[in-house]
Amino acid sequence: MKRIGGAILFLLLTFAIFGFLFLKAQAKWHTAEEAEFPRGPHITVYTDLPQGTVSLLLPSFRADTGICADVTEMTGAEMKETLRAGKRADVYLASQKVLMDLAETGAFASYTYGTEAVPADFKDEDGRWTGLFVNPVVFAVNRDFAEKNPNFIYSWNDVWQRKSVRIAMLDFHATEFSSDSLMCLVEHYGTEEAYRLLAEAAPHVVQYGEYLSMPAQMAAMDKCDIGISGYHEARRLQADNMPIRIMYPEEGTWCFLYGAALDAGAGNEAKAFFDWLFYKGASDKTLSENGFLFIPANAETPPLDDAGGNLYVWDLKKKYTESGKAELLGKWVRDVRFADNS
């Protein structure tokens, strides 16, 4: 009997110890789960901004407001398809054309609080979306070229027509940024003049690149004199001490814009995120510290170029259709990219 009693006592102690350890582990698991998926107010965000951009802002937003945001990164096309399938978010951070197209479907609320500092050209006139960041197209100039040609005029006409200048630019088929660039050129110059200028430039384009950073990298490596580049991409190279100078086109330029919009059914937490973005988020130093060097759309004074020049952005409506874009891209391939323009 004593042996049986001892065995029972041993089993009871064993179960007690395992029970204690199980409860402790479960409590620890719940703590970890809450850290990863914290309770409290939540919002959902869809974005096509460069990977990781929005996630950098979330710790600061949560610390300021106590609101958590779940971010889903996708392409602009995927965002449109997701909304067509009835899967909505609270806030949308996306490129201008995506926001323009979705606004026409009635997906967004009209909301203008805190957006007064954003220029009219960078926001919807009905308040359905507002520009958050701009990435203007600039000249990334090889430093040696700039020093040897101190009187060079950094205008579109001079860059495209000066045969001795080696140019690198994006293939207009490569990215949304580059195809949007072709649409902007056509809208500003008109179809005939835009293609004439592009054809005139073609013989001294040394590379049509597939990646956004390529034109500025080519200039930094002295494989071209001037890379037609996004400001963000050129600034990142400068931050890495690469030998380029950023020059703004004298007669103005176009920009790729990212903006924010509220879903038509968004609540107060979503509005708090929207307000925070324009009050603090767009200029949060966390972005620049991690290499995201866009210009805030509500900047009081955009940065000067490396010669002290001001940025002038063309007034463009960008109301083109996908079929119209495809037609113009096809024309560029036939009449410029693979034509004999020598």
Give a label for each model feature.
Residues A7-F22:
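Hydrophobic membrane-insertion alpha-helices, especially the h-region
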Residues R3-G6, F22-T105:
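Early extracytoplasmic/lumenal segment of secretory-pathway proteins
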Residues D90-A94, D225-G230, R245-I246:
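Paired acidic/hydrophobic, glycine-rich loop segments that form the ligand-binding mouth/hinge
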Residues P302-S342:
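Extracellular/periplasmic bilobal clamshell ligand-binding domains
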